[in-house]
Structure formats: structure tokens, C-alpha cells
A protein has these predicted regions:
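Key residue(s) within conserved catalytic/signature motifs
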Residues: 283, 303, 308
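The DHp (HisKA) dimerization/phosphotransfer helix of two-component histidine kinases
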Residues: 59, 204, 208, 258-259, ...
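P-loop NTPase Walker
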Residues: 2-164, 169, 244, 268, ...
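Conserved helicase/translocase P-loop NTPase motor core
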Residues: 23, 80-83, 87-99, 146-150, ...
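Hydrophobic residues in beta-strands of the RecA-like P-loop NTPase core, especially within AAA+ ATPase
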Residues: 278-285, 316
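ATP-hydrolysis module of ASCE/P-loop NTPase motor domains
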Residues: 35, 118, 137-141, 158-251, ...
Length: 320
């Protein structure tokens, strides 16, 4: 095929696919149609970032890589090119199926897409909007929070980390109650070591992937008495959580990251499953959430070589 034919076919195909997204502005539409590789979208509040995610998912399911690839159907002819050029100008409904067949390139099964957000409310809204746009085709998309995604991953393979798959999840109240008991038993004054402060130290350590033992040893080596006492509480907290087969909210993401980075076969399973990873409100991600998203997308993560190009789209507020 000539270079001119290929270029014209690619342009016509993209024009046809764009017809489904004419309700978006030019920048939003470009973001929706750019499907391959990493993509960062920064915009202010109320600019339609979530709308872009939803339409991007719709495009992936219907057209796959069609708008963002140089590949042509092996059977493409000049007649097909003329058809697409005409359809882009006058999209007749009775020709829609032929247009779809010429434009779709490896349309994505819904279960190969994961869209992660931060709150259950936001995840539920994402699911509802996807269902309104796609119908039952949206059911298998993982529209989910970081914590819920981690729970699903851990329920399948957490035994690799020495926990039972029926692990209990401690909420904030559970964690606080346990820490209060620990501090009392260790004779740590609650005015000098408020339980919330101790838990905050532990949370920051987990986000940096610093274990209780490493935290304590670092404090002991530096001679920081306060941190050494907090390290004792951290170790006792971790031991009791393990004995109870329990994980707190930080543990969910921490252990999901550990599971993926320490078990190449588990990592490979999820990287093969999820061809596309989308993250909402990216400006709110912490270190562990970044590591989890990177691992799922196939990016380099803690020395683990990427299995493939990372098809990850993140949207964030540049004012936050």
C-alpha cells in the first residue's frame, strides 16, 4: 500500500471514530483518542476530567487502538478508504457496522480495563456513568478504589505473604483501639505518645515501605529515643495484626505492592489482565498508590522490568 493511502486511511479512520466524541472539546477528544502509552492530563476542577476517563473507556471498548495506531486492516482497499471519508462527512446509521469493522483495532474487553479513584462514592459514580453510556458492557470494568483493588488482589494470593486469604480488615477505629492497648501495655504515656501520632508515624513508614524492624533499628542506631519507643509500638502492632490475620487500610496497598513486586508470576498475571490503567485525582496519590498503579500498568517498579509498554492514563488537578 502506498504511503499516501495509508496516511489517508489513518486520517479517515480517526475522523470516523471522533464522531462518537463530538460532545467533547478538542483537548478532551484528543485525550480520549490517544490510547497508547502513558498519558498525563492536568486540568482544574469542573473541567470534565472524569468525563474524559469515561469516554476514554468507551473508546477502548468500542474501537480499541483504532484512533492511535498506524496499523491498517490487511484487506483495506481504496473503496474502503472512500467509504470512510464519506462516512466521516455523512454518517448514515445503516452503514455504522461497516464503519466499526474498518475502524476497530483490537477492541478491549471490559475486564481488561481498571479505572482507579479514591473514594467509594467516586467509584460508584464512575460505575453508574459507565453503565449509562455502555449498558451492561460496563459491568466487567474494574471501576474501583485503590483499597478495593488491593483487597481483590490480596484475596487471591495473600497466602504468598504468610496470611490467610480470609484476612480481616481493620478500620480506623479498630486500629486505634489496638494501638491504645499496646501503648498502655508498653507503659508509653498517652500525652507523650498520643495514639494518633504513633499511628501517623506508622502510616508514613508504611508508605515509604519501611518495616517495623527497619524503623526500630534506624531509630536505635541514630539514638532517637522517641522514635525508638514508637518503633517498639510499631513492631508490637505489626505482630498482633499478623497473629490476628488482620490488615489495616495502609496494609492493604502495602501488601498488594509487596505481593506484586516479590512474585513475578502474580505481577505478570495482572499485567496481562489489565491492558489499560486509568487513575482519577492523581494529585492525591501517595508513594504506595503510585507503586501499585505503576506495577499494574507494566511500568518499571522496584527493579522489576516492565513486561510491556505502560498504557496508563492519569488525570489530576494542577491547582491542588
Amino acid at each position: 500500500m502506498s504511503g499516501t493511502f495509508t496516511e489517508n486511511f489513518i486520517r479517515a479512520r480517526r475522523d470516523v471514530i471522533a464522531l462518537d466524541f463530538m460532545h467533547l472539546n478538542d483537548i478532551q477528544r484528543q485525550a480520549v483518542l490517544t490510547t497508547e502509552g502513558p498519558l498525563l492530563l492536568l486540568a482544574g476542577a469542573g473541567s470534565g476530567k472524569t468525563t474524559v476517563l469515561i469516554n476514554r473507556i468507551a473508546n477502548l471498548i468500542k474501537y480499541g487502538r483504532g484512533a492511535d495506531t498506524d496499523e491498517l486492516p490487511a484487506y483495506a482497499t481504496e473503496q474502503d478508504l472512500k467509504f470512510l471519508e464519506g462516512y466521516a462527512k455523512n454518517p448514515a446509521p445503516d452503514h455504522a457496522e461497516r464503519a466499526l469493522n474498518l475502524c476497530a483495532v483490537e477492541p478491549v474487553e471490559p475486564w481488561r480495563i481498571i479505572a482507579i479513584t479514591f473514594t467509594n462514592k467516586a467509584a460508584d459514580e464512575l460505575k453508574a456513568r459507565l453503565e449509562r453510556m455502555l449498558g451492561t458492557g460496563a459491568d466487567d470494568v474494574w471501576a474501583i478504589t485503590f483499597h478495593s483493588a488491593s483487597v481483590r488482589i490480596l484475596r487471591r494470593d495473600i497466602d504468598r505473604l504468610g496470611f490467610d486469604r480470609s484476612f480481616t480488615i481493620y478500620d480506623t477505629s479498630d486500629s486505634q483501639s489496638l494501638m491504645k492497648r499496646i501503648l498502655k501495655e508498653l507503659d508509653m504515656d498517652d500525652k507523650t505518645y498520643p495514639y494518633r501520632t504513633v499511628l501517623n508515624y506508622i502510616s508514613k513508614a508504611k508508605d515509604a515501605m519501611i518495616s517495623a524492624e527497619a524503623f526500630y533499628q534506624s531509630a536505635d542506631k541514630s539514638g532517637d529515643i522517641r522514635k525508638r519507643h514508637i518503633g517498639r509500638a510499631y513492631m508490637e502492632y505489626s505482630n498482633r495484626m499478623k497473629a490476628s490475620n488482620a490488615l489495616d487500610f495502609d496494609d492493604l496497598i502495602l501488601f498488594a505492592v509487596k505481593l506484586l513486586t516479590e512474585n513475578p508470576d502474580v505481577l505478570d498475571y495482572y499485567q496481562r489482565r489489565f491492558r489499560y490503567v486509568l487513575i482519577d485525582e492523581y494529585q492525591d496519590t501517595n508513594n504506595l498508590q503510585y507503586l501499585l498503579a505503576s506495577a499494574l500498568a507494566g511500568g518499571s517498579n522496584d527493579g522489576v522490568p516492565p513486561r510491556r509498554q505502560a498504557n496508563i492514563c492519569v488525570v489530576g488537578d494542577d491547582d491542588q
